[in-house]
Amino acid sequence: DIVMTQAVFSNPVTLGTSASISCRSSKSLLHSNGITYLYWYLQKPGQSPQLLLYQMSNLASGVPDRFSSSGSGTDFTLRISRVEAEDVGVYYCAHNLELPYTFGGGTKLEIKR
């Protein structure tokens, strides 16, 4: 199985500044077709996870372009520019390169008070 690894907490960020969340996979998620099968989800408090980005860098419908993702085959970064209070929650990376699809343990976005 492919193991997705994330830090439990982000570095605390101030509202209005940028945040970065990292994810590492134990196997390259770059397919021979050129697609990287890496996904990012956000689970806000009391809600189900929502898809943010698919195939590494494509924004899901309705997701603001403050969110972006980049990376290599195994190391990925989710970037949030101009962090807002509504961005608080747990961010998960996941893959669907091959079965079983697996998720990282999640990274909680910490806001400086």
Swiss-Prot record:
GO terms for biological process: adaptive immune response; immune response. SUPFAM superfamilies: Immunoglobulin. Keywords: Adaptive immunity, Disulfide bond, Hybridoma, Immunity, Immunoglobulin. It comes from the Eukaryota. PROSITE patterns: IG_LIKE. Residues 62-93 are annotated as: Framework-3. One of its GO terms (cellular component) is immunoglobulin complex. Residues 1-23 are annotated as: Framework-1. Residues 24-39 are annotated as: Complementarity-determining-1. Residues 55-61 are annotated as: Complementarity-determining-2. Residues 40-54 are annotated as: Framework-2. Residues 103-112 are annotated as: Framework-4. Disulfide bonds join C23-C93. InterPro entries: Ig-like_dom (IPR007110), Ig-like_dom_sf (IPR036179), Ig-like_fold (IPR013783), Ig_sub (IPR003599), Ig_V-set (IPR013106), IgV_Light_Chain (IPR050150). It holds the Pfam family V-set. This is Ig kappa chain V-II region 17S29.1. It comes from Mus musculus (Mouse). The lineage of its organism: Eukaryota, Metazoa, Chordata, Craniata, Vertebrata.
